[in-house]
């Protein structure tokens, strides 16, 4: 195991392309502001996909988002191509190479791509997955289907960070959310995953890179959130995005098994252009208390295994513990922060 969620093969894994962290919540914000982001004012930082208020259907919103998503991935691939080229020219790891069988046999350094017999890996991170999925779900449900909100009202609410718009925020927070075994939202999540993998499969080799889709942010969803304004899932401006393939903070209301099922339903098992998917789940102490609780936990892990999911990390915490940790972090250093 390498890091938190990756499996590695000794003496087979060789070149691993430095990964790109892509803020897909930025792609969503570019849809709302026609290629702009609130933090950067009038600067055009993405594609100009049209005025949000002019979209007449959810399909048009989704099409605009996917254009922004593909544009970010494409630029990440171009960047990775240059990194790969420069890395082999300027970096070397003599000690690590001397310990690797294939490097010794081929007289090549680990930083060189295409070592005979080796497995070349690379990946890009989807940061803000559930934030984007939940936001698109809320737009689809509340604006285009139930018509409880107008596009103008949504833009005004997020543009003002929901100050004076708490009623709208509550509507958004109670829209269908990923992590609740709700096919309405999970189908959107599966589509975003599919489109990312299809793009990777088609264009990765053309651009000279091997890049798989990965959802392991470590803690990057926190600083990435600091450049993203309020989002249509009810998230406040510049607060953390969702982490990994986990549900948005506080959005998983139907229990931990529902989170597993959403994670399963959003994966595209037929595609191979995917890597690790980090999944964090919180359990209350009462859920795992005593022999009965231990048995429940065992069955939960078995369910995760049977669903062929990649990674599972559960933290046994209650709300009061987390609040105390915020006040006195030095007393809670053993809490896992991934």
Name the predicted role of every residue range.
Residues 1-336:
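Conserved catalytic cores of very large enzyme subunits
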């Amino acid at each position: 195991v390498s890091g938190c969620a990756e499996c590695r093969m000794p003496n087979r894994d060789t070149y691993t392309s430095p990964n790109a962290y892509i803020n897909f919540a930025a792609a969503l914000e570019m849809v709302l502001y026609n290629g702009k982001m609130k933090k950067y004012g009038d600067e055009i930082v993405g594609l100009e996909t049209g005025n949000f208020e002019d979209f007449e259907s959810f399909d048009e919103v989704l099409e605009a988002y996917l254009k922004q998503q593909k544009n970010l991935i494409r630029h990440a691939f171009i960047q990775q191509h240059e990194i790969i080229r420069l890395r082999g020219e300027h970096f070397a790891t003599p000690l690590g190479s001397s310990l690797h069988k294939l490097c010794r046999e081929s007289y090549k350094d680990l930083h060189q791509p295409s070592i005979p017999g080796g497995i070349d890996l690379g990946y890009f991170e989807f940061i803000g997955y559930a934030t984007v999925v939940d936001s698109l779900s809320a737009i689809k449900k509340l604006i285009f289907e139930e018509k409880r909100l107008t596009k103008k009202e949504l833009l005004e609410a997020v543009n003002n960070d929901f100050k004076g718009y708490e009623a709208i925020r509550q509507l958004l927070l109670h829209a269908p959310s990923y992590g609740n075994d709700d096919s309405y939202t999970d189908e959107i999540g599966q589509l975003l995953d599919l489109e990312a993998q299809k793009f990777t499969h088609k264009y990765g080799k053309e651009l000279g890179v091997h890049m798989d889709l990965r959802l392991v942010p470590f803690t990057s969803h926190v600083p990435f959130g600091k450049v993203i304004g309020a989002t249509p899932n009810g998230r406040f401006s510049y607060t953390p995005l969702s982490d990994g393939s986990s549900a948005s903070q506080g959005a998983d209301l139907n229990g931990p098994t529902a989170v597993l099922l959403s994670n399963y339903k959003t994966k595209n098992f037929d595609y191979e252009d995917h890597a690790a998917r980090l999944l964090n789940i919180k359990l209350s102490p009462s859920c795992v208390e005593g022999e009965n609780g231990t048995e429940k936990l065992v069955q939960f892990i078995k369910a995760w295994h049977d669903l062929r999911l990649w990674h599972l990390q559960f933290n046994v915490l209650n709300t009061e513990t987390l609040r105390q940790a915020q006040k006195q972090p030095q007393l809670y250093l053993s809490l896992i922060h991934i």
